[in-house]
């Protein structure tokens, strides 16, 4: 996973939640050891909302628009809900520390490969 704006890269497995079931389950009941990228049908705020139901630990969540520019980010704790401040087309969920490792800030552009 690469922060194009800052030139920072981390090597981590990337998986996609590109259908309803994968988006519904997300990282529930799992320890996050990889990055899960949600591909939403539309760029929206409400449909980009996330929850920490049945999560075992906090995760980093990054919201991106259709240009893969960061529009919001948060640390999602178990059993909490979060609605991004701006519409998102992609949601990146990963283990705590991803945001810091990539020095991610709103406005940065991210890139990824299916598997690294």
From Swiss-Prot:
Q: Which NCBIfam families match?
A: PRK03760.1
Question: What protein family is recorded?
Answer: Belongs to the UPF0127 family.
Family matches, as PANTHER family: UPF0127 PROTEIN MJ1496
Q: Which InterPro entries match?
A: DUF192, Saro_0823-like_sf, UPF0127
Organism, as annotated? Pyrococcus furiosus (strain ATCC 43587 / DSM 3638 / JCM 8422 / Vc1)
Q: Which Pfam families match?
A: DUF192
Q: Which residues, if any, are the signal sequence?
A: none
Q: What is this protein called?
A: UPF0127 protein PF1050
């Amino acid at each position: 996973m690469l922060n194009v704006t800052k030139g920072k890269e981390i090597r981590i497995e990337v998986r996609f939640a590109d259908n309803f079931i994968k988006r519904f389950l997300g990282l529930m009941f799992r320890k996050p050891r990889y990055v899960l990228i949600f591909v939403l049908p539309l760029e929206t705020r409400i449909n980009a909302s996330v929850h920490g139901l049945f999560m075992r630990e906090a995760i980093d969540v990054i919201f991106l628009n259709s240009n893969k520019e960061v529009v919001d980010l948060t640390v999602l704790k178990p059993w909490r809900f979060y609605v991004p401040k701006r519409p998102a087309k992609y949601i990146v969920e990963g283990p705590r520390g991803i945001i810091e490792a990539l020095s991610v800030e709103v406005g940065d552009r991210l890139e990824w490969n299916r598997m690294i």
